[in-house]
Amino acid sequence: MENAYICDAIRTPIGRYGGALASVRADDLAAVPIKALIERNATVDWSAIDDVIFGCANQAGEDNRNVARMATLLAGLPEEIPGSTVNRLCGSGLDALGIAARAIKSGETALMIAGGVESMSRAPFVMGKAESAFSRAAKIEDTTIGWRFVNPAMRAMYGVDSMPETAENVASEFAIGRDDQDRFALRSQQRAAAAQESGRFTEEIVPVAVAQKKGDPLWVAKDEHPRATTLEALAKLKGVVRPDGTVTAGNASGVNDGACALLLANERSAAKFGLRPRARIVAMATAGVAPRIMGVGPIDAVRKVLRVAGLTLEQMDVIELNEAFAAQALAVGRALGISDDDERLNPNGGAIALGHPLGASGARLATTAMYQLARTGGRYALCTMCIGVGQGIALVLERV
């Protein structure tokens, strides 16, 4: 079996909903980090790319009709290079990376690009066709996040709780209090701010040129979602599900825009094109859980991937646990034996501070983990995420 190595990884800044990247189409946004890979790796014969696999959770708007293929062409790769878009909702970007790695490990491919994209700001409203002629029962659905066009059988079998409702379910079932959630959220903001101030994200971010109505483009070079806060300020926020709820806008991830791309190669291709392997993709695993507590999906996914990798949680030097909600992140961490303030856990902040552009987030986790391993000299990193409709995904990296 071949080894699959990450040789380079880069992402756009993460934009706020309706923020600096809101005017950029998803396919154009996805092309940005691919172009950056091309520019940063001049020794590569890009006609040798076997496939481009991108994750995207929406695909109802400008990201329709295989956004990976669109981005491949828009980035200037040869038209002979194929592209495929995968959708495991929030886990799409990490899934794309794992799929690409498995293709290389099997020997079927040698050089791949994997990543993800999401423009939640530009997610469209959609309307289904009428069930009968001349019907006036048309319903418009917002595709930004969560359920739409719900199957009545799914509603009857599992319910269709919104994402914040699933977090409240987790908080209740796993006894995660409001104060603990707010403290976790504050740590995320503080760590993200420290990472930004120290320039830790510089190597992994490619600035995005955003066209303006007049004059020069606006260059966006910094994550837009982090915000200064205090425990007192967080405590004043009302629950988003119910007034006495524990899940608030302050201890939940954002609705965001962003894209990320990674260059993968086997050992021969890396040597042939003068690439430096930075991390080996050790293993990936997925798991299913009840949709109403989808946030705890990483528990079984992590246990499974560690079993496949033959490793333990104690061997992980970096743990990138996607912070969809503080409630679910705490529930996952505690179930796995990770302390709430573990220094290995999201050392540069997580999605509560940085944002969660759904299809891009998994690729972002792997990118940030790779650079963190290089900075600290750690050996192993764990990346894991919960997934809407009740799944979890986990991936292990080893620094080379």
Mark where each language-model region is.
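Flexible glycine-/small-residue-enriched beta->alpha junction loops
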Residues: 111-169
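N-terminal extracellular/periplasmic Venus flytrap/periplasmic-binding protein-like
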Residues: 11-12, 23, 27-32, 43, ...
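Conserved active-site "lid/cap" helical segment
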Residues: 1-71, 75, 82, 166-178, ...
